């Protein structure tokens, strides 16, 4: 037999990307098929045709009788069987190499984007797209490849083809020469002058090897079926768990929120620009419409911006209070604002709020003046 080292090295690489059932199947293939075929089986069938004798002296009769009894040698038949059942596994290995090549490209691109991010370039959306692609290809941290998506489908298809090839070769072997060998074969074929008897060398030993290879084929077929069910239920389980995965819900296009695009208010609420011009004061009873607090891009809060907002608001109310105007308390409500580190560094550290002096032009009555001079339990001590 030829050298099996090349095929063995390729199949050995599949071990790292197979399930437990796949690893057992590869072990059976290596030990009980390739190793046994290259050592014991080849020596048993080495003198196959030379030891095939017929009770005639007619030239060419033994050759035609041997060709009729054994259209293909058992050893070559098993070699073809090993090659065919290994091809789907090699195709799956090619898909794994393709995913690993994709991983190298994505990692290289991710490093370039991170370098650009240190220079102040906004690359968050591109980095998010790379993470989604890695999840799609089944790439995890530390170079580990997980069976997911197209890789999982390729693995299932490879198991199906291996099972089909196992069944097909078992049927072909049974159709050609069965699962046992006889000591005597009767042949009546030209150029034999009459019906002749041909004798096979070591039929019992060869029958034992045939039965052994049959059992190994059945074990491999059973492992393929078990692995197929295991991968199927594992895929269903991952699909159910995938609903809670952070990447599972990322199906829409990655685009920034449109709510934060237009600067409408001078205060730093959730959807306003810190550099927007001051808007005129609202009339009494008007409620300031702030941004959507549930927006994921407007959830973070900045302490310094909050203090600056209230300082601006206090200054405006003081000016309006000195002019004799009153402002409804409904205007004083908290604001939402984004967590912008660059803008927060430029803002002041905040000011203490001064109480608003509300001027009332009407003269106070005696009752009200007496009531106002009495201390009340809810009065504040200054």
UniProtKB/Swiss-Prot annotation:
A Pfam match: Connexin43
Region span, Interaction with NOV: 244-382
Phosphotyrosine PTM sites in chain numbering: 247
PTM summary: Phosphorylation at Ser-325, Ser-328 and Ser-330 by CK1 modulates gap junction assembly. Phosphorylated at Ser-368 by PRKCG; phosphorylation induces disassembly of gap junction plaques and inhibition of gap junction activity. Phosphorylation at Ser-368 by PRKCD triggers its internalization into small vesicles leading to proteasome-mediated degradation. Sumoylated with SUMO1, SUMO2 and SUMO3, which may regulate the level of functional Cx43 gap junctions at the plasma membrane. May be desumoylated by SENP1 or SENP2.
Presence of keyword Transmembrane: yes
Membrane topology summary: Multi-pass membrane protein
Positions bearing Phosphoserine: 5, 255, 257, 262, 306, 314, 325, 328, 330, 344, 365, 368-369, 373
Biased composition range(s): Low complexity: 362-374
UniProtKB keywords: Acetylation, Cell junction, Cell membrane, Disulfide bond, Endoplasmic reticulum, Gap junction, Isopeptide bond, Membrane, Phosphoprotein, S-nitrosylation, Transmembrane, Transmembrane helix, Ubl conjugation
Segments on the Cytoplasmic side according to the record's topology features: 2-23, 98-155, 229-382
Linked residues for Glycyl lysine isopeptide (Lys-Gly) (interchain with G-Cter in SUMO): 144, 237
SUPFAM superfamilies registered for this protein in UniProt: Connexin43
Residue intervals on the Extracellular side: 45-76, 177-207
Biased composition (Polar residues): 317-332
PTM sites of type Phosphothreonine: 275, 326
GO MF terms held by the record: beta-catenin binding; gap junction channel activity involved in cell communication by electrical coupling; gap junction hemi-channel activity; monoatomic ion transmembrane transporter activity; tubulin binding
Region called Disordered, residue ranges: 317-382
Residue numbers carrying S-nitrosocysteine: 271
Subunit comment: A connexon is composed of a hexamer of connexins. Interacts with SGSM3. Interacts with RIC1/CIP150. Interacts with CNST and CSNK1D. Interacts (via C-terminus) with TJP1. Interacts (via C-terminus) with SRC (via SH3 domain). Interacts (not ubiquitinated) with UBQLN4 (via UBA domain). Interacts with NOV. Interacts with TMEM65. Interacts with ANK3/ANKG and PKP2.
Role noted for this protein: Gap junction protein that acts as a regulator of bladder capacity. A gap junction consists of a cluster of closely packed pairs of transmembrane channels, the connexons, through which materials of low MW diffuse from one cell to a neighboring cell. May play a critical role in the physiology of hearing by participating in the recycling of potassium to the cochlear endolymph. Negative regulator of bladder functional capacity: acts by enhancing intercellular electrical and chemical transmission, thus sensitizing bladder muscles to cholinergic neural stimuli and causing them to contract.
Protein name: Gap junction alpha-1 protein
